[in-house]
Amino acid sequence: MNSTPDAFQRPAIRALTPLEARVLGVLIEKQHTVPDTYPLSLNALTAGCNQKTARSPVMNVSEAEVLTSIDGLKRLSLASEGSSSRVPRFEHNMNRVLGIPSQAAALLTMLLLRGPQTAAELRLNTARLHGFADISSVEAFLDELAARAPALVVKLPRAPGERESRWMHLLCGDVALDEALAHGVQEDAVPPSEFEALKAEQKALTAELARLRAFVEYMANELGIDADKFTRES
């Protein structure tokens, strides 16, 4: 059995930029969640890219930047512009270009929009795009995407402190496992402000314990009790 390489080959199409990946993910998501307004206008597409919820990382991009990314996706045939409206509207062609079923497209979409996730998280997050019966069915489609030549997703080794492995898409190019794991650890790390608060709380508790110990020793001396005796017996 071959050992796991440090990086995985990207799809045959060129690697997407982070914003191209976000634009593609938004187009697929909104096709399912707001079908009445799909294909999307540039304004709606930009709003979807800058959405504060269900996005990782959160972006703040302009319509001009989104339009540049659309042009890049057009050259890859991953997106196209509709011709039935006076206002330019855009749609995706990912299923056709990559040759994947809707179930796999739903999983890729969530990975594009939310970053690395476990199979359980993906099942929950894809509910509005496709309802997977159980986690094993999610894993089956992920395994299929990972087994493609070239692979479209990769299963990351479990990072310290994690109970399950996360999956990551490969549409933005090769993934260095060390970098991906470091990113996962950073996400789970305690923020510096919270760490400082914990240190201050520990210091206060230590001082309070010292005051209580001094009070107990004082009362023991007043009552003629050997305080150390209780410590030894306990």
From Swiss-Prot:
- Give the superkingdom in one word: Bacteria
Pfam families attached here? DUF480 (PF04337)
Of which family is this protein a member? Belongs to the UPF0502 family.
Q: Which PANTHER family does this UniProt record tie to the protein?
A: UPF0502 PROTEIN YCEH (PTHR38768:SF1)
Recorded protein name is UPF0502 protein BTH_II0990
Its taxonomic placement starts with: Bacteria, Pseudomonadati, Pseudomonadota, Betaproteobacteria, Burkholderiales
